[in-house]
Structures are given as structure tokens and as C-alpha cells.
Amino acid sequence: VTNSPALIDNLDDLPLPARHLLPMDQYHMTATRTNEEHSYTISVARGCPFKCTYCYRTFGKKFRHHSTDRITNEIEMLINKYGAKEINLEADTLTLNKKFIIDLCEAIIKKGLQKKIQWTCESRVDTVNKEMLELLKNAGCWQISYGVESGSQRLLDLVEKGEKLEQFEHVFRLTEKVGISIRAFFMLGIPTETR
């Protein structure tokens, strides 16, 4: 019998990644605007309360996040030490906690970091609205990845996605209107999928 590992509630208790052990000059994310700029990932949050049947849910259902100070200090370190031009703010759903994402965007803007880097994230269409998207854009977000998974509502319901095709259409239009690029994830071969 293997018990699940205990959740780390205060993510700030975790040390910074040992990036000094890596060849940081070789890290270029494929989603960057030029594919040549130094681009790095910061893990900012863990956990997702949704029950999509295909998900691995490594970090459990409880959403926890680093403090905004920890995140903005790590962004500054990546800019100053490694020449970061782009950052991926890694979280299952960055926009899940409205207060957290508002505080984070405001902290990024207050430190002027949006003038030095641009960033990407992953989100769900049922956790954003026009005002939030505008704030994300103003804080330097240039691309949001949404997990669409399928263009079939029947298949979305089958995998318990909890979102409607109409929501994707609406939020994609809003995202595009505020000037944020969209990246969509799809799965092929969901059980019972025939076309």
C-alpha cells in the first residue's frame, strides 16, 4: 500500500529551483514569440478542484499558490541573472483564484516587470472575464493556453470537463479582443470518438 504524499500547503516553504545546476542559456520555449529568446518557467501554484476524468491531478484538488512577493522576486532574478525575456507562469489553472491573480498582476505592474518580460499561462474559460483578461494583458501576458480537449459537447460531457462549447467561443473572442494570443489544447481519440 502506498499512501499519497502529504500536500505542501505553504508553497513558499519550497526552495527555489537549483537553476545554477542547469545550462540555462539553452532554454528556449517552443511557444515563445521568436523561439530565440531566453524563456523560463516558474511554478506559481498547485492543485485543481475540477474533476476532468483524463487528468492526472498530481498536486491534488486543493489550490495553493506561492506569495506574490516570491513570484515577482523569482521573475526579477530570472531577468537579472539569466536574461529572461519571457516566462511561463505554471499552474494547472492560473486564474482559478480571482484575488490571487489580481494581486499577482498588480504586483507585476507595481514593480514594472511587464516592461521587461512577457509571460504565458494556462487557464479555463470558466475562470476568466473581460476585466481579468484586460488586467492579464496589462501585466504582460501575451498568450493563454486553454484546454479545449474536443469540439464535441458530448465528448466534453463524457470527460466531465464542466465547460460548454459556447463558453469557448465567447472567451476566445474576448481573449483575442484584448490582444492576448490563444493556444488551445485538444485530445484526439477520446473513447467513443468517431470523427
Question: For the regions a protein language model found, what residue spans apply to each?
Answer:
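Radical SAM [4Fe-4S] cluster-binding motif and immediate context
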Residues: 18-185, 190
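Glycine-rich beta-alpha loop elements in corrinoid/cobalamin-binding modules
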Residues: 1-11, 15
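Active-site glycine- and acidic-residue-rich loops that bind
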Residues: 192-195
